[in-house]
């Protein structure tokens, strides 16, 4: 059976995966871009945006693993956009422009489904009001023999971990303190017992922690 993977998921030292006060102007809330600066400097990120250059080393080695072998993605509505409640209209098409970097079916979990949204480059957003297990069933069907990536945000990743549906979890611990926002680890005591855990820290103090199901 295909695996369920999480890649390049950044949290602060105090466990927050996004800041407080997310909005259209501040997608990451008061954290701004600090959780993701390590990723923005990689070749993988720059190539996703049609840019040359970018660093190599450990950050690039782990960042580049996010795409190979992926046939579908699942994300929460808060990752897709800043709106809450019923959709005012169908004009919002995500943060990523006309050609999002996914190039696969993407299943957006929301209590307010809307028609599917095909984009350039092979990405189609499907909007589901579904449990993690049901969303995964549909994503696996779309992915065929390829893996399914859980793209975030923290509430969605936490729900899939609580349901024991994730096989590979790559967490990036960034050396900042946020103090508030949305935490990842709440109610997941003993999670590490399910996995083989490895870590490596870069000279800049960013720690990559990988949880792999034995």
Regions inferred by a protein language model and the residue ranges of each:
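Enzymes that bind and transform nitrogen-containing heteroaromatic metabolites
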Residues: 1-214
């Amino acid at each position: 059976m295909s695996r369920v993977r999480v890649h390049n998921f950044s949290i602060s030292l105090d466990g927050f995966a996004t800041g407080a006060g997310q909005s259209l102007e501040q997608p990451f809330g008061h954290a701004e871009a600090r959780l993701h600066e390590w990723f923005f400097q990689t070749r993988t990120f720059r190539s996703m945006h049609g840019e040359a250059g970018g660093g190599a080393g450990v950050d690039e080695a782990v960042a580049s693993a996010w795409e190979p072998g992926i046939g579908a993605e699942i994300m929460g509505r808060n990752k897709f956009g800043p709106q809450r409640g019923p959709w005012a209209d169908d004009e919002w098409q995500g943060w990523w422009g006309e050609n999002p970097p996914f190039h696969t079916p993407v299943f957006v979990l929301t209590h307010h489904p809307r028609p599917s949204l095909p984009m350039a480059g092979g990405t189609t957003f499907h909007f589901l009001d579904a449990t993690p297990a049901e969303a995964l069933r549909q994503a696996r069907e779309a992915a065929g023999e390829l893996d399914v990536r859980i793209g975030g945000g923290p509430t969605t990743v936490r729900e899939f971990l609580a349901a024991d549906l994730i096989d590979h979890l790559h967490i990036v611990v960034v050396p900042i303190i946020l103090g508030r926002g949305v935490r990842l680890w709440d109610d997941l005591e003993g999670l590490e017992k399910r996995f083989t855990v490895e870590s490596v820290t870069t000279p800049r103090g960013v720690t990559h922690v990988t949880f792999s199901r034995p």
